[in-house]
UniProtKB/Swiss-Prot annotation:
Its main location: periplasm. One of its GO terms (cellular component) is periplasmic space. It comes from the Bacteria. InterPro entries: Alpha_CA_prokaryot-like, CA_dom, CA_dom_sf, Carbonic_anhydrase_a-class, Carbonic_anhydrase_a-class_CS. It is an enzyme of class 4 (lyase). Disulfide bonds join C46-C199. This is Carbonic anhydrase. Substrate binds at T195, T196. Belongs to the alpha-carbonic anhydrase family. Zn(2+) binds at H109, H111, H128.
Amino acid sequence: MKGKLSIALMLSVCFSASATDSVHWGYEGNGDPAHWGKLSPDFSLCETGKNQSPINIRQALNAQHDPLQLAFQSGTQQIINNGHTIQVNVSPGNTLLLDNETFTLQQFHFHAPSENEIDGKQFPLEGHFVYKNADGALTVIALMFQEGAANPQLATAWQQIPARVDQAEDVRTPVAIQALLPTSLNYYRFSGSLTTPPCSEGIRWLVLDHPVTASAEQISQFSSVMHHANNRPIQPLNGRIIIH
């Protein structure tokens, strides 16, 4: 299992990076989000795309959509600071059933402050759980954190952040993914994109409407490791429908 996870890590260390290692991009200076679309032809959607993420979630349509069907399985994890985020890669076994398709969790990572907003409210931290189906299509479950009580699962992750950038470490005490999520799994749904280059579209976004808590110290610790904000600015909705 460890070998399989290591191979997966090498092939796709981060959907945030998305095979963009040869082109420097980031959140500051000439590599910041305003410049992404011009850094490489592969990044053109960052500038020209019409279904980009993140968005400000507002005026959502109330609709009957299926409850989240999640399954969790304990397994091995690896944690890495890739310079853009703190990411936890997970072994197979955690699944999402959506639109009669099975998606498998690949990794989860964080942005501070939040990328998506809900009715104009920005949260201090947002987690993205990246799922992939057999055809390679992606679904992202987004989880908001509000300042409050310390989060035990974040504490588990933060204690194991590697000292060096791009250094992957086996997680000695795995993060309990189910325990990281709220008890209520109501969500907003819309079509969007990766929030990092190459900004690929066609991503199914499910943004949970109930935040969980993280302490001010935990939020500050993440920001200190990143040394800068790592959120892409809000993108135009361009007539997209949001359902809730």
